[in-house]
């Protein structure tokens, strides 16, 4: 597959996403946003977009390190804060997380990672309530499709400007926006434990899976056609299973329909057609 297939006109993408943020935040009746700034590329891109769309004074970045967090993560997050001139707060999650960890075996990294992600979201939404600011998400399309994230943790937000951009496209947008190169080229990691990396967890690279997902979704190619492109059947089957199995993470809880008008099914909320005053 030609790598150019994933390339976008990032100037147009920037304009679309800035307009999206401005319009959606106004619809909710807010003027400012808060987001978790990890020192990674996804949150850096969202922070930059929000700053350009709303103004740096309307963006609050919350840095939430754990005692095992990489020093680079903190340094890179602070680098972006200084570059953009946005407001920022640091809130350690160590005490809260360690209280939970007392009952979780050290080898159960999945549960521990979920606890850390959900603890960060508790802090984020509390600051959101304190500041009367909307929580903006940072999960990219690759993560959402694969279910590589924590439900009601790092996947929780009111709006997400980058959820339709593959990880490789996030890199392209980051370069267009002038994100510091060390944030773009660093090994992708949720920083949940020392030495953890996304691609080691997944067992494949973002470049590999993005090309496969693009063929599956955007090109709507069937299995046989994709395998003809050189993709192994084992890889195809594994990724397809992940996409199907994690559909529940990409939607609100399913509601059993009883009445003639059911929230989320056939009732349109007021904010869908009028601005909240």
UniProtKB/Swiss-Prot annotation:
Annotated residues for binding of Mg(2+): 42, 143
Binding positions for deamido-NAD(+) per the UniProt entry: 118
Protein's pathway: Cofactor biosynthesis; NAD(+) biosynthesis; NAD(+) from deamido-NAD(+) (ammonia route): step 1/1
InterPro entries to which the protein is assigned, alphabetical: NAD/GMP_synthase, NAD_synthase, NH(3)-dep_NAD(+)_synth, Rossmann-like_a/b/a_fold
GO terms under biological process: NAD biosynthetic process
Annotated SUPFAM superfamilies: Adenine nucleotide alpha hydrolases-like
Keyword Zinc assigned: no
Alphabetic keyword roster: ATP-binding, Ligase, Magnesium, Metal-binding, NAD, Nucleotide-binding
GO cellular component term of the entry, any: cytoplasm
UniProt enzyme class: ligase
Catalytic activities: deamido-NAD(+) + NH4(+) + ATP = AMP + diphosphate + NAD(+) + H(+)
Gene Ontology MF terms: ATP binding; glutaminase activity; metal ion binding; NAD+ synthase (glutamine-hydrolyzing) activity; NAD+ synthase activity
Residues that coordinate or bind ATP: 36-43, 138, 167, 189
UniProt EC number: 6.3.1.5
Description of how the protein assembles with itself and partners: Homodimer.
Function noted in UniProt: Catalyzes the ATP-dependent amidation of deamido-NAD to form NAD. Uses ammonia as a nitrogen source.
Similarity-based family: Belongs to the NAD synthetase family.
PANTHER family the record matches: GLUTAMINE-DEPENDENT NAD(+) SYNTHETASE (PTHR23090:SF9), NH 3 /GLUTAMINE-DEPENDENT NAD + SYNTHETASE (PTHR23090)
Name of the protein in question: NH(3)-dependent NAD(+) synthetase
Organism per entry: Chlorobium phaeobacteroides (strain DSM 266 / SMG 266 / 2430)
Gene: nadE
């Amino acid at each position: 597959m030609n790598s150019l297939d994933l390339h976008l006109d990032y100037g147009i993408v920037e304009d679309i996403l800035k307009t999206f943020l401005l319009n959606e935040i106004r619809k909710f009746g807010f003027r400012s946003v808060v987001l978790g700034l990890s020192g990674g590329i996804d949150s850096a891109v969202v922070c930059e977009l929000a700053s350009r769309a709303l103004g740096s004074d309307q963006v609050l970045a919350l840095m939430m390190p754990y005692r095992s967090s990489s020093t680079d993560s903190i340094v890179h997050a602070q680098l972006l804060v200084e570059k953009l001139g946005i407001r920022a707060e640091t809130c350690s999650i160590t005490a809260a997380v360690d209280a939970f960890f007392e009952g979780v075996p050290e080898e159960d990294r999945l549960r521990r990672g979920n606890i850390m992600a959900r603890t960060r979201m508790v802090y984020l939404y509390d600051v959101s309530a304190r500041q009367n600011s909307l929580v903006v998400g940072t999960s990219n399309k690759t993560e959402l499709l694969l279910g590589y994230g924590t439900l009601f943790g790092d996947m929780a937000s009111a709006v997400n400007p980058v959820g339709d951009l593959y990880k490789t496209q996030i890199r392209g947008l980051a370069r267009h926006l002038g994100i510091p190169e060390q944030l773009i080229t660093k090994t992708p990691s949720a920083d949940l434990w020392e030495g953890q990396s996304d691609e080691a967890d997944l067992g494949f690279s973002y470049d590999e899976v993005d090309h496969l997902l693009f063929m599956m979704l955007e090109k709507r190619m069937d299995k046989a056609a994709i395998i003809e492109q050189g993709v192994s059947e084992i890889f195809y089957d594994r990724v397809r299973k992940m996409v199907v199995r994690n559909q529940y993470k990409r939607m609100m809880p399913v509601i059993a329909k009883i009445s003639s008008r059911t929230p989320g099914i056939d009732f349109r909320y007021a904010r869908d057609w009028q601005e909240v005053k």
